[in-house]
Regions:
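Short alpha-helical transmembrane segments in multi-pass integral membrane proteins
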Residues: 1-22, 79-146, 192-241, 297-362, ...
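N-terminal transmembrane alpha-helices
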Residues: 9-41, 45-46, 62-74, 78, ...
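Transmembrane helical elements of multi-pass membrane transporters/channels
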Residues: 20-39, 140, 151, 174, ...
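Short runs within selected transmembrane alpha-helices of multi-pass transporters and secretion channels
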Residues: 72, 141-159, 167-175, 200-213, ...
Length: 439
């Protein structure tokens, strides 16, 4: 077991901390993003219906990740808090609850998804071919998601102990296995059976299991006595629910946007799905910052170093905006080329080109609207974190998407920049009130 350097988060220069712990996370997320792109590329070459099915399944995959990663973030934050007050025994107690808790979550999620999948597919599209692909792909990636659940928990345990290298290696290995298996299983190369969309799903879960096995040795902790489970689980979810809400809200707003776009065409749904594939690539810096600032802020807040909490927030915002400006340029300069990587459907390309222009504009304000909830989560302001997430995803995204869509498909894409600007303003208001209460 690796133990944390208890003074590092509290004494080292903030920019140096982030430069040390963020690159491994970024590299791992880069490989994950490349996997998402390559996975969709192979499926798109196999069939257009399969590509649409991936767009429809995407919200469910986000929900699965939200439950797993959000629980892991709760454990990570609890461990970082107790490490901040030099109580390593208590920190490891929370780590020990992680494995039994995540296995229970996996069983529950797998059972619900297996029985719910046909209804979800029929709700999302009228195409029989797409419905079939959704059911096949969705059932495999949900029922066999044990690798995703356990890897998420063990990764967060290691990150709480400043071990960013092992999770990076695990995620890279899992993604590379996935990428290697995709063409073999989808197209039936080297004498293997041609499995199509099912092959893509199998490659996904195999890669997840490989990643989980790599982090298991260092991430697994001995379970504490059952008597502490109720109290500790309540504390884990007090800290983790904001992240779960934030991530699962993505599920419901993307599902809502998919249903709105489905009133226009399946091609519109596919265009939105391709945006999220590319978004995962360009949001690597932001995702890494979200992951890395939580233990830093949580540690310093527990130690009474509010000045370092503020510095961590400002450093992540400035760095995130600078990096996301590159994404804004790319989405506005070469949207057609990005779409043609996956599809030759002229309708998808035409719809997506317009959409990419408007969505790219939203990247800069999106930095603040996504970093603020993480900050509030790390300092234990769960209500503010949750409210900000609800405002963005429930109050704004889907209602605005519906209203703009009534004006026409092109107007629908205004939803993204308008939502991010309003959320940023609300986040600034919450932050100022929080800081006033600290004086």
């Amino acid at each position: 077991m690796e133990t944390t350097n208890s003074n590092y988060f509290g004494t080292e220069k903030i920019s140096r901390i982030l430069l040390k712990i963020a690159p491994p996370v970024m590299l791992a997320q880069l490989i994950q993003a490349l996997y998402n792109i390559v996975d969709s590329l192979f499926v798109g070459k196999y069939s257009e219906s399969g590509l649409t099915a991936l767009s429809i399944i995407y919200p469910l995959q986000l929900l699965m990740i939200a439950i797993a990663v959000g629980t892991g973030v709760g454990i990570n934050t609890a461990m970082a808090h107790y490490l901040g007050v030099h109580d390593e025994k208590k920190a490891n107690e929370y780590g020990g609850i992680g494995t039994p808790l995540t296995l229970a979550l996996w069983v529950l999620f797998a059972a619900v998804c297996f029985f719910f999948m046909p209804a979800y597919a029929r709700m999302s599209t009228d195409s029989p071919e797409v419905i079939k692909d959704v059911i096949v792909y969705g059932r495999i990636v949900c029922v066999f998601s044990i690798g995703l659940f356990t890897e998420s928990i063990w990764t967060k345990i290691l990150q709480a102990n400043e071990d960013m290298k092992t999770p990076m290696i695990a995620q890279i290995a899992g993604a590379l296995v996935n990428i290697a298996l995709d063409p073999l299983f989808i197209f039936g190369l080297f004498g293997l059976p041609k499995l199509g969309i099912a092959g893509a799903a199998i490659a996904t879960v195999v890669g997840q299991i490989v990643a989980a096995l790599i982090v298991m040795k260092k991430g697994f902790r001995k379970s504490p006595p059952l008597s502490v489970y109720p109290r500790d689980i309540c504390f884990i979810y007090k800290l983790g629910i904001p992240n779960i809400l934030m991530q699962s809200a993505y599920t419901f707003y993307i599902l809502g946007l998919n249903l709105i776009l489905a009133t226009f065409s399946d091609q519109a749904v596919t265009a939105l799905g391709l945006y999220y594939k590319w978004q995962s690539f360009f949001f690597i810096p932001l995702g890494a910052l979200q992951t890395c600032i939580v233990p830093v802020i949580s540690y310093n807040y527990a130690s009474g170093r509010m000045d370092r909490c503020k510095k961590t927030l400002s450093t992540s915002l400035v760095g995130g905006m600078g990096l996301m400006f590159i994404g804004t340029l790319v989405f506005n300069l070469i949207p057609g080329q990005m779409l043609r990587v996956f599809t030759s459907d002229p309708q998808v390309i035409a719809i997506g080109t317009v959409g990419f222009h408007f969505v790219g504009i939203s990247f800069i304000p999106m930095v603040t609207s996504l970093i603020f909830p993480v900050f509030f989560q790390a300092v234990g302001a769960a209500v503010k974190s949750s409210l900000l997430t609800v405002v963005r995803t429930v109050v704004l995204f889907v209602p605005l998407g519906y209203l703009f869509s009534r004006l026409g498909l092109n107007y629908f894409w205004f939803t993204f920049p308008v939502t991010e600007v309003i959320t940023t303003l609300v986040g600034v208001f919450f932050y100022r009130r929080f800081m006033a209460q600290q004086k």
